Regions:
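N-terminal glycine-/charge-rich "phosphate-binding" loop or analogous flexible N-terminal tail
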Residues: 1-49
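Phosphate/diphosphate ligand-binding glycine-rich loop within oxidoreductases
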Residues: 50-102
Length: 102
């Protein structure tokens, strides 16, 4: 499984979640831009990705159009207003929120 991690703080205070994913053989792709990604940057990063651990980056219809393998978006933070949830639902992409993580 290929996981895009856009949040720069994910795993910063506790490495256990990252370690668990690596132990399962998952490929973790960290945010190489080190800032909240623009729509264009997200469009470049999502092809071939199965899951996104999402910070404040925007997941629009245009981003989802490029996400050919995406199955789940897990919002690492508060709220999901940065995700086109209606479009994700149409495509059968699950959207979750990780509570109490910030």
């Amino acid at each position: 499984m290929k996981v895009l991690i856009t949040s720069n703080s994910f795993g910063k205070f506790d490495e256990a979640p990252r370690k668990r994913m690596l132990d399962l053989g998952w490929e973790l792709l960290d945010n190489r831009y080190h800032h909240i990604m623009s729509e264009e940057e997200m469009m470049n990063e999502v092809p071939g990705v199965d899951a996104i651990i999402l910070g404040s980056d925007i997941v629009s219809k245009r981003v989802l159009d490029k996400a050919d393998k995406l199955k789940i978006i897990s919002r690492y933070g508060v709220g999901i207003d940065n995700i086109d949830t209606a479009e994700a639902e149409k495509r059968g992409i699950a959207v979750t929120v990780t509570k109490n993580c910030n």
